[in-house]
A protein has these predicted regions:
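Bacterial N-terminal signal peptides
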Residues: 8-16
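Class I SAM-dependent transferase core
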Residues: 24-81, 87
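Class I SAM-dependent methyltransferase SAM/SAH-binding core
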Residues: 89, 93-145
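A short acidic, Gly/Pro-enriched loop at the edge of an enzyme's catalytic core
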Residues: 146-155
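A short SAM/SAH-binding and catalytic strip from SAM-dependent methyltransferases
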Residues: 154-168
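A short glycine-rich, Lys/Arg-flanked "PGG" loop and its adjoining helix->strand segment in the class I
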Residues: 169-184
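Conserved class I S-adenosyl-L-methionine
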Residues: 186-211
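Core SAM-dependent methyltransferase catalytic element
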Residues: 223-239
Length: 239
């Protein structure tokens, strides 16, 4: 009887230990690590799980013919109020879908197409050469830096990429450093508040969450231009 009680106690302690390990949350000074969404990396920032980066294998989806209708990209670009001599950074440029639509509007300026995937930059370079476009330059960034010169950028565009930054604190600090003092950051993310937007939850972001994270990085929300079908068009400026 005594042995049975000891055995039962041992099993109970073991099960409690397993449960504790399964639910364990690791926290650093910046980020939290725990299991979450299947499409997330298990790393959290300010209550938001970071999503996996879409690989270059999805490049055809970026160039899909329905994209203008779904996202109204032409209106997004109008929202940026581009000037001919401006220097623009398209962060997470992917296939160059936005960069090549911006380039003709800054004919005296330049568009930096920044991505961490060399395959994406290779595709941009091929398009650039085939269309003889001279004011788009590719930049290989890293998970922590956009590798752009300090105070060189008038406007930054990030379309559905910020939520995939593995190191959002470091990346936004790098972007902020690259922006001119009066520069603007256009943060485009699928609206988490709108359940009708047919995108997975982890690939969406609410205005409240975006403002929370940008505020921590030293940015203020100037305005949220609410004229896109699925996305927020949030304009941030340095504090």
């Amino acid at each position: 009887m005594k042995n049975s009680a000891v055995l039962a106690l041992f099993i109970l302690c073991f099960l409690m230990s397993v449960e504790s390990t399964a639910q364990q949350v690791t926290t650093t000074s910046k980020y939290t690590y725990k299991r979450g969404d299947f499409n997330g990396i298990g790393k959290w920032y300010m209550g938001r799980e970071i999503a996996y980066v879409m690989g270059f294998q999805g490049i055809d989806w970026l160039e899909r013919s329905e994209r203008e209708k779904e996202e109204n990209v032409s209106t997004l670009i109008k929202n940026m109020e581009l000037q001919a001599n401006e220097i623009i950074a398209d962060i997470g440029a992917g296939s160059g879908y936005h960069a090549f639509r911006i380039a003709p509007l800054v004919e005296k300026g330049l568009v930096y197409a920044v991505d961490i995937q060399a395959e994406m930059l290779s595709a941009i370079q091929n398009t650039k050469e085939s269309k003889n476009i001279t004011n788009v330059e590719t930049i290989l960034g890293s998970e922590k830096s956009v590798n752009l010169t300090q105070h060189s950028i008038d406007k930054v565009l990030m379309v559905d990429v910020y939520h995939e930054f593995k190191f959002p604190i470091e990346m936004i600090a790098s972007i902020k450093n690259a922006m001119k003092p009066n520069g603007q950051l256009f943060l485009i993310e699928y609206r988490a508040e709108d359940l009708s937007v047919p995108i997975k939850k982890i690939h969406k972001m609410s205005e409240k969450q975006a403002v929370l994270e940008m505020k921590a990085a030293g940015f203020n929300l100037k305005k949220n231009i609410r004229n896109l079908p699925w996305q927020h068009c949030m304009v941030f400026e340095k504090e």
